[in-house]
Amino acid sequence: MKASQFFISTLKEAPADAEVVSHQLMMRAGLIKKLGAGIYNYMPMGLRVIRKVEAIVREEMNRAGAVECTMPVVQPAELWQETGRFDKMGPELLRIHDRHGRDFVIQPTSEEVVTDIARQELRSYKQLPKNLYQIQTKFRDERRPRFGLMRGREFIMKDAYSFDRDQAGAKASYQVMAQAYRRIFDRFGLRYRAVAADSGAIGGDLSEEFQVIAATGEDAIVYCPASDYAANMEKAEALAPAGARPAAKQPLTVTPTPGKSTCADVAELLSVPLSTTVKSLVLATDETDAAGEIIRSQVWLLLLRGDHDMNEIKVAKVPGLDAGFRFATVAEIADHFGCKPGYLGPLNLQKPVKLVVDRDVAVMADWICGANQEGHHITGVNWGRDLPEPDMVADLRNVVAGDLSPDGQGELAIERGIEVGHVFYLGTKYSKAMNATFLGEDGKPAFFEMGCYGIGVTRLPAAAIEQNHDERGIIWPDAIAPFTVVICPVGMDRSEAVKAQAESLYADLLAAGVDVILDDRGERPGAMFADWELIGVPHRVTIGDKSLKEGQVEYQHRRDASATKVGVADILAHVKERLAA
């Protein structure tokens, strides 16, 4: 490709709404152009990156035995109503009507459609296992799209779906896909971690995320440096402190704390560690009738250490809260505690509540909590003496660095990551909901055991940039660079020697199968170099009259601070050697 034929459009400054580095550089390098909130044009330079991502994904999916198909972007609502996701997904699922008033959705994933295919086409155990995948446009109506392609509304995703006759087969298919994902991300040349994850709205009971390590990542990744343990923050288990609960030493005392409504404020006032305070979080669950009207509500009190944060995913697994919960209203809090938020605690309640205690709080002694009296807290609170031993103890919090690893191999560490892939073992969640069966070896109908496997094709380039950039621009890994080599002839329009050498090297690289672009635009050297450093092509060959007279050209890798002089006769071999490194 010659630059004069290509579409190159770079910016000196990033748009004001571009918050993270990848968004800024993708806009400045002309990879994407914003069309609307969370919706982007993939410009020619950016599309080349996306196509290279797709090619690697496709190769490894095919190698793993998956078969490509394409499912519609617009899908009948009836299928989504069968599984209940039409209502459960909420506003993220874009719903539309056709001219006849029929309901449709714009696909965010395709579990329903692929399960419908399976129940029609896969009739016997002899046809199993099967794995269908697509690389297709998706849409999720994100409430706050941001960070460019990192969290857009329209995006390209590779989604695969496996169908097996039993759990053993399904889990084997899951492992095949997980290994394929490792090969994919290894080929991209990215630093990543595979972490245990919660299955969320997709469902299932076995799940891993593939997280590209980046300081700007939205997700917290928990891992143990001394072992292979890794999980996302939602999933990582917080173990109870080792050892027995200390004996009570302090008397129960109501202490004035005027204007101190947070644990941090109280700890500072009383000159005690924040870890000796306990925060009270008040939730409510509702029972509704057939019309959706609330019949009765139950108020719950959760106790966590003052220096810990509640993990909503874990809370949602507590029996009684697993059908859904909300934060209690101010009126409900006043009715049960006789006090406004900021001074709440488990003692001196106006009405009974259901109490759930975090593991750490269950082994605390002489702790501090609200007195259910404005401007007051209670110190020296102890289980068994001042309160009955808690009936419901659960892991309710996010882990913190230094916590014990659940595998017992050391302490936990935390870093940031960008989720670029996710694999799920679904079991029969969707096949049962849609009555998707096959005839088993015993001649009886059986539900498909399923798995689903996603890769964010358009998120991957953004994640790669977050991990590979400097003050001058992007530094693409070779595997997904828009072009692998750029030839920069200085004064090509004025020097026949420069032009001839540039054209000759260009032809040689093309013949060798190298993805090369020749910059024949006639730009000034500074502007030409700035463009390609911004765009991030990893290998650059500069040809100028002065170096040619010495029988040399200059080679520079995008990560190198300076260029290396290479003989004209050796440059082709030198580039090939660097590409193979």
Curated annotation (Swiss-Prot):
Superkingdom of the source species: Bacteria
Listed EC numbers: 6.1.1.15
Gene Ontology cellular component annotations, sorted alphabetically: cytosol
Gene3D superfamilies: Anticodon-binding domain, Bira Bifunctional Protein, Domain 2, YbaK/aminoacyl-tRNA synthetase-associated domain
Reaction(s) the record says it catalyses: tRNA(Pro) + L-proline + ATP = L-prolyl-tRNA(Pro) + AMP + diphosphate
Localization annotation: Cytoplasm
Described function: Catalyzes the attachment of proline to tRNA(Pro) in a two-step reaction: proline is first activated by ATP to form Pro-AMP and then transferred to the acceptor end of tRNA(Pro). As ProRS can inadvertently accommodate and process non-cognate amino acids such as alanine and cysteine, to avoid such errors it has two additional distinct editing activities against alanine. One activity is designated as 'pretransfer' editing and involves the tRNA(Pro)-independent hydrolysis of activated Ala-AMP.
Subunit description: Homodimer.
NCBIfam families the record matches: PRK09194.1, proS_fam_II
Record's protein name: Proline--tRNA ligase
Organism: Acidovorax ebreus (strain TPSY) (Diaphorobacter sp. (strain TPSY))
